[in-house]
């Protein structure tokens, strides 16, 4: 393929280039005109929506003008201030913030894919706050424990040193009475020292116990347990043996989908036991999509819960009272 280019001169110059095999074979994609919808999992888009610096979802997206790579505004500005005047992805030269431009369209796309992002970020901040609180408490407890152990060892060494010095002084004088008094004095000095050492050792064991308790508490604290009263929906659930109130205690990090899957497996297992069957096919086909979880609002209406919501988030958003949370279940219409 050739192209004639007119220059300022009297005769045109011809420019020739060769097409690659891809360029020769490629065809335009056909436009979708029949209303077909293509479902794409948000997880498959994570690499496209992730900031290469913080490895989290892009926030206040900034795009480089030269190479068009995207970063969080805070991340790329911090990187430029630290002295690395280059793109973290391709190492292309970036002079300053003037080499960046905001990308509100990409932020709008992310908010369209993840409409509940604010709730997700609030949950992440709460989890990080719990982890930081536990780490600070554990570091303080460990520091106190080590300090008590060092103090106990120093007291013990001082007591032994005083015994040796008093004993050697008595031998040099050769006075038996003085030796007796010195040994008595040494024992008296060593006695309180040993007592103090023992007390310190005893007190040193207390942080161990507290530390052991703290080693368990953060796990419980990071995933605080939530008590549930799981009732059948008063209008959508048929009155049969499976329609009974269930009482559950589980982790606050469990999602509504986990609850639906548990309910499906539980009811399938109860059905097998009632029929006396041993076929496990019903358990394998149990899905979280079989049941829909509801919560009653203040207006007396039932709100369908998003399957990705954690129970802790549901409690903070809808329940807000210090008593077991009441949820309702009913078969999903597509699975009836």
From Swiss-Prot:
It comes from Pongo abelii (Sumatran orangutan). Its main location: nucleus. One of its GO terms (cellular component) is ubiquitin ligase complex. Pfam families: RAWUL, zf-C3HC4_2. Monoubiquitinated, by auto-ubiquitination. Polyubiquitinated in the presence of UBE2D3 (in vitro). This is E3 ubiquitin-protein ligase RING2. There is a cross-link at residue 112 (Glycyl lysine isopeptide (Lys-Gly) (interchain with G-Cter in ubiquitin)). One of its GO terms (biological process) is epigenetic regulation of gene expression. The gene is RNF2. There is a cross-link at residues 249, 323 (Glycyl lysine isopeptide (Lys-Gly) (interchain with G-Cter in SUMO2)). Keywords: Acetylation, Chromosome, Cytoplasm, Isopeptide bond, Metal-binding, Nucleus, Phosphoprotein, Repressor, Transcription, Transcription regulation, Transferase, Ubl conjugation, Ubl conjugation pathway, Zinc, Zinc-finger. It is found in: Nucleus; Cytoplasm; Chromosome. Residues 157-213 are annotated as: Disordered. It comes from the Eukaryota.
């Amino acid at each position: 393929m050739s192209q004639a280019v007119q220059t300022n001169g009297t005769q045109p110059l011809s420019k020739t280039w060769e097409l690659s095999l891809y360029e020769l074979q490629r065809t335009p994609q056909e436009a979708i005109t029949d209303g077909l919808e293509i479902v794409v999992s948000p997880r498959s888009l994570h690499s496209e929506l992730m900031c290469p610096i913080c490895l989290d979802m892009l926030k206040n997206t900034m795009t480089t003008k030269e190479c068009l790579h995207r970063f969080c505004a805070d991340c790329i500005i911090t990187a430029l201030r630290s002295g690395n005047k280059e793109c973290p992805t391709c190492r292309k030269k970036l002079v300053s913030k003037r080499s960046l431009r905001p990308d509100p369209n990409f932020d709008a796309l992310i908010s369209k894919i993840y409409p509940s992002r604010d709730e997700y970020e609030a949950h992440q901040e709460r989890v990080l706050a719990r982890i930081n609180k536990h780490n600070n408490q554990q570091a303080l407890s460990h520091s106190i424990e080590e300090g008590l152990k060092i103090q106990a060892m120093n007291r013990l060494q001082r007591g032994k040193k005083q015994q040796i010095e008093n004993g050697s002084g008595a031998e040099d004088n050769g006075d038996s009475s003085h030796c007796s008094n010195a040994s008595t004095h040494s024992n008296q000095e060593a006695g309180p020292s040993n007592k103090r050492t023992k007390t310190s050792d005893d007190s040193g064991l207390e942080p161990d116990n507290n530390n052991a308790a703290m080693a368990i508490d953060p796990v419980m604290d990071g995933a605080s347990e939530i008590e549930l009263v799981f009732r059948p929906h008063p209008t959508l659930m048929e009155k049969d043996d499976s329609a009974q109130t269930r009482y559950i205690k589980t982790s606050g990090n469990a999602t509504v989908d986990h609850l639906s899957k548990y309910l499906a497996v539980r009811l399938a297992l109860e059905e097998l036991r009632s029929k006396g069957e041993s076929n496990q096919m019903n358990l394998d086909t149990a899905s979280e999509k079989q049941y829909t979880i509801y919560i009653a609002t203040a207006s007396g209406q039932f709100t369908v819960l998003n399957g990705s919501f954690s129970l802790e988030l549901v409690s903070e958003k809808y329940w807000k009272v210090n008593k077991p949370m009441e949820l309702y279940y009913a078969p999903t219409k597509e699975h009836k």
